């Protein structure tokens, strides 16, 4: 195979942070090369340098054997390097074709009017090459995330990309959508396109990757054949340490007092007659397929979505919760599945994010901020949760996903919430950070906190939950103890309503 990209002794630093040190990487034509590492390992920085988002400090990049310097994404696109970010870069109000050729739309003879027929025809041709059935005239905002991702791939291919960088491409996809994405990746691979595949999902490696390069703490560790290397070996290279397993402790949960009881809750089409109890010291797992209503239940209890009927009882007393402020006043915290949108102020620093939900506590004379007290509080939680940051004044956006998630947790711990909803707490974070989050959740339960964990990863649900509640199409279809819960039983309950509907 021909070498498309070769990186040698690459270095990159930001203020106070050494992001890359003497990194090497090679991508061959027609291969899927997985890039693995904990959050903060330097994967994203390396890919952004290859895509022209960042410039290197030193080192060498060869493209087709020739030295190159990408000063902007346009430079990278011009030679055929495309990147598909985890957060899709699309304009929802524009059509599929307009997004694919944005800024390069074909014009009429005078160059003034958009030639929509030619635009749609060119977009259709690219989609046909991918064997994707998608109307070029469809508005992107009306598409599923999976279909939007196909638009991003088509957009990259419109530049005749020979190198395609995919950052966590399956994070928001279901199994059928992942299978379709893999089909397209294999099609591109057969045409000689080199694909850099960044993911934290180990099970995907054996399915799609040819080789794996592992990074740790901004440095190159190893490149291995995916087929010949065990998942355990890759994890060991990623973290540089042995991950201790976290076993549920069921005795406390069985004996704990009821902290939260939800009775016959109705809130929109995805919360229908939902009832459950949550005990102090317990981790209650919520499982189900996408669209089952798990997030909607959490949002309704937290006051983020309106409740039509039902009761919410906190510590034995009926609670009136119409807004998130009401929920917080009753000691309920909610960590959203979209931490960047709903959990963090990414333009602010670490200490401001930690105290922001309880800012009144840090006011003097209801006006002046007690900066020293804020600094002490932030330092306490940075130490308690093991948040890796150069300082409490570091901008949150510069931290890894795992550390950002810990900051959101710190925010609710500072409010001293007794009931905590964790919605997809490990989404988009690496295996080492996941293990730290697991330890933290178990520690919180050990202190008597009542924890709800919503997760789409069944191994995570089975590993962490004292009990498992399963939902399908807005209703609870079953409850399993930790001893009873298996992937097969959970999936049976998660598809029960679909099965009944099909049988009918």
Curated annotation (Swiss-Prot):
Query: Which compartment or compartments is the protein found in?
Result: Cell inner membrane
Quick check: keyword Cell inner membrane in the entry?
A: yes
Single GO cellular component annotation? plasma membrane
Chief location:
membrane
The protein's matches in InterPro entries, at most eight in alphabetical order, are given as:
AAA+_ATPase, ABC_carbohydrate_import_ATPase, ABC_transporter-like_ATP-bd, ABC_transporter-like_CS, P-loop_NTPase
Instruction: Specify which residues bind ATP according to the UniProt entry for this protein.
Output: 37-44
Q: Which SUPFAM superfamilies match?
A: P-loop containing nucleoside triphosphate hydrolases (SSF52540)
Catalytic reactions on record? D-ribose(out) + ATP + H2O = D-ribose(in) + ADP + phosphate + H(+); D-galactose(out) + ATP + H2O = D-galactose(in) + ADP + phosphate + H(+)
- Cysteine-cysteine disulfides: none
Q: Tell me what topology the record assigns in the membrane.
A: Peripheral membrane protein
Q: Where is the ABC transporter domain?
A: 5-242, 241-498
Q: Which family does it belong to?
A: Belongs to the ABC transporter superfamily. Carbohydrate importer 2 (CUT2) (TC 3.A.1.2) family.
The name of this protein is: Putative ribose/galactose/methyl galactoside import ATP-binding protein
């Amino acid at each position: 195979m021909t070498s498309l990209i070769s990186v040698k002794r690459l270095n990159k630093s930001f203020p106070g942070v050494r992001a890359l040190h003497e990194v090497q990487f090679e991508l061959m034509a027609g291969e899927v090369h997985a890039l693995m590492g904990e959050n903060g390992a330097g994967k994203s920085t390396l890919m952004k340098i290859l895509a022209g988002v960042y410039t290197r400090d030193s080192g060498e990049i060869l493209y087709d054997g020739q030295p190159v310097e990408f000063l902007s994404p346009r430079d990278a696109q011009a030679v055929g390097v495309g990147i598909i970010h985890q957060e899709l870069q699309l304009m929802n109000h524009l059509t599929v074709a307009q997004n694919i050729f944005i800024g390069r739309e074909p014009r009429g003879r005078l160059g003034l009017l958009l030639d929509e027929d030619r635009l749609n025809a060119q977009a259709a041709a690219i989609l046909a090459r991918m064997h994707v059935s998608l109307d070029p005239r469809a508005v992107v905002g009306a598409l599923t995330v999976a279909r939007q991702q196909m638009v991003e791939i088509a957009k990259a291919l419109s530049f005749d990309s020979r190198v395609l960088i995919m950052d966590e491409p399956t994070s928001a996809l279901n199994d059928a959508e992942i299978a379709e994405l893999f089909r397209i990746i294999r099609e591109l691979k057969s045409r000689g396109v080199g694909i850099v595949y960044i993911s934290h999902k180990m099970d995907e490696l054996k399915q799609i990757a040819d080789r794996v390069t592992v990074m740790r703490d901004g440095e190159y560790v190893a490149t291995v054949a995916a087929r010949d290397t065990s998942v355990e070996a890759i994890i060991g290279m990623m973290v540089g340490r042995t991950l201790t397993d976290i076993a549920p402790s069921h005795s406390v949960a069985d004996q704990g007092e009821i902290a939260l009881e939800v009775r016959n809750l109705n809130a929109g089409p995805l919360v229908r007659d939902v009832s459950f109890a949550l005990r102090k010291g317990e981790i209650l797992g919520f499982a189900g397929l996408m669209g089952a209503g798990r997030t909607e239940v959490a949002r309704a209890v937290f006051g983020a979505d309106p409740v039509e009927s039902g009761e919410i009882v906190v510590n034995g007393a009926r609670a009136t919760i119409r807004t998130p402020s009401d929920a917080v006043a009753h000691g309920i915290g909610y960590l959203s599945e979209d931490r960047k949108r709903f959990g963090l102020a990414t333009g602010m620093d670490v200490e401001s994010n930690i105290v922001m939900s309880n800012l009144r506590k840090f006011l003097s004379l209801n006006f002046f901020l007690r900066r020293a007290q804020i600094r002490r509080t932030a330092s306490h939680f940075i130490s308690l949760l093991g948040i890796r940051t150069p300082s409490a004044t570091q901008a949150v956006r510069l931290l890894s996903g795992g550390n950002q998630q810990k900051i959101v947790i710190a925010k609710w711990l500072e409010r001293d919430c007794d009931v905590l909803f964790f919605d997809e707490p490990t989404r988009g974070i690496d295996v080492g950070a996941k293990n730290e989050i697991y330890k933290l959740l178990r520690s919180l339960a050990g202190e008597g906190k009542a924890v709800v964990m919503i997760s789409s990863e069944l191994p995570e649900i089975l590993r962490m939950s004292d009990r498992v509640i399963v939902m399908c199409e807005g209703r609870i279809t079953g409850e399993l103890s930790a001893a009873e819960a298996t992937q097969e039983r959970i999936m049976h309950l998660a598809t029960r309503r679909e099965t009944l509907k099909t049988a009918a």
